[in-house]
Amino acid sequence: MKTISTYPMNHQSDICIDVTLMIEFDTKPVLNQKGFIRIYDYDTDELVDELDLSIPSGPTAPRKNPEAKYTTGYQYKSENITNKNTKAGSLSMEYRSSPDPYQLTIIGGFKEGFHFYPVIIKDDRAMIQLHHNLLEYGHKYYVLIDKEVFDGFDGIDYKDGFCFSTKKERPIGNRFVVDKNHGDFYTVQGAIDNIPDFSDVKYFVDIKNGEYEELVYFRNKRNIVITGESKDGVLIHYANNEVFNPHPEYVKTNEKVGTFPSRRAAFFMDNCHGIVMRDLTVKTDLHGQAEGLLVNGYDNCFENIHIIGSGDALQTNGPAYYRNCIIDGEGDTILGRGPAFFENTTLNSKGAFMWIRNGKENHGNVFVNCMFNGLDDDATIVRLPDNKGISYPDSECVLINCTLNHVPDIGYGPIEGDSKKARLWEYGSKDIHGNEIDVIHRNTVARILKDEDRDIIEKYMDYHYVLGDDFKMSL
């Protein structure tokens, strides 16, 4: 097997510090579970990073977890936690945890770490993901790769076989470009890592068209506008789910504000306020409990984005606004505590469109002029199951002037537990031909609003009523 090219090219300069390395072969390479990939400082020969390919990337089967608390608190401090100064897998709080025998990297300051794929094979190319935040500006590095890493590979065992130099200085200003070829950063994560926590200054991240196979996680960010060059041209995706990156054994996640965060999404913003995302696609490549996008925070706005997930394709916690979006999922397609306001958005779901978990302190999910497209016979609008003795009696879902396609006549269900206070309200629903839907067979828990309920309808058409008078619209 012959090496055709590398990225960076040998002795190439002006490389982003968040670069993903690439080797192109003359045939599709076979990755072995042995050998090392090592990165050294060219001038000092100091080891900078090491990937041990004998370590599996992450779990491939579900783990049976003991009963755990949902409400374990989590401290969102602004700390400079990276792979350079902290061992991935360190505990940020006191809880029992078994040793982690998988690949781990710290992303976005999450010291517990994420399982990741150090090498991803794409056709005849091997994409090599280093541990995050280890390369520095103004340095030259060389790469050594054991011949055992790939079948039929001669290896790279000398200093000038694969070397490159990073950009001389960190980009300045408040606007950064993500681009594989000529950007300030190679990855979305790299650009966001460059933005300080809790900033009052507005920052802009512009993403050029391309495929970005990366797990994105950031926390404590404020006032960032993330814009893709085009919705269909920018794809940010990763193979992640609850199996591959499960919550700790004795902790459950995201049940209340300030509790331990999940690690199973492809793109996750955590304790973030005033974030705008537009004109891009986020996607998880795995099935199961697997969010394409997971949002924790306040005053976050999304426009013209495509979210592709499996179960829980979108988890949305805290006041958030969605306009002209597409959300594809495989059941409980929208999960979370809310409140969330959706306008002119299309939902495609193989199972129930949502499982709402809001409490009485805030609204749930409200949809105005949206499209619900059921992809199988079980695509009810909402289900409210009993979750091991836990239910959400104040759940709220309101549909106003929405189009429903292949949604069961019952509309809502299964509904378990106390539902007397649930608000499952609907007004003006029509089919794809514009005809009024016959709602005579709707679940008795649901309420069909009439024209005489105009005051209620007008309130729910106002995002401020749903998200709060202090919600800051950024679109």
Regions found by a protein language model. Give the residues of each.
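Acidic, low-complexity Ser/Thr/Gly/Pro-rich repeat segments typical of extracellular/periplasmic
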Residues: 2-170
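Sequence-level preference for short, compositionally simple segments enriched
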Residues: 168-475
